């Protein structure tokens, strides 16, 4: 960016911030019926229906550290969406899996993205291009710590 681009509206970071905040706000309205935050939503989507995974692997998928994930997973467990079980061979290794209730909401949760997308006046091709651009940006600049 040029040096003269010092106004807030011209800052790339501000555009990311506003986009993220406003999109999450839209998701939040749909997530209320499931008593989920946006972070809880992405964590549930990141866990496969028949999958058991540890916190480190899950954290790498969603770009969250264990300090953020641990309290979130406790809340999701209280709500009946996930189980947290310790490995018999290594009690430090906590395995996360979806419960039946967690599996049952996977489909309705996956439909939320479509509902949010429909709120924007955006062509499908435009959305695909934006997603690919953002995916390339994330892949290039942010490493998942697996």
From Swiss-Prot:
Domain of life: Bacteria
DNA-binding positions: 55-78
Keywords: Cytoplasm, DNA-binding, Transcription, Transcription regulation
Domain HTH marR-type: 9-139
Pfam families noted in UniProt: Staph_reg_Sar_Rot
Single Gene Ontology MF annotation: DNA binding
Keyword match NAD: no
GO cellular component: cytoplasm
Location of this chain's protein in the cell: Cytoplasm
Chief place of localization: cytoplasm
InterPro entries the UniProt entry points to: HTH_MarR-typ (IPR000835), Transc_reg_Sar_Rot_HTH (IPR055166), WH-like_DNA-bd_sf (IPR036388), WH_DNA-bd_sf (IPR036390)
Family to which the UniProt record says this protein belongs: Belongs to the SarZ family.
Name of the protein in its database record: HTH-type transcriptional regulator SarZ
Origin species: Staphylococcus saprophyticus subsp. saprophyticus (strain ATCC 15305 / DSM 20229 / NCIMB 8711 / NCTC 7292 / S-41)
Gene symbol of the encoding locus: sarZ
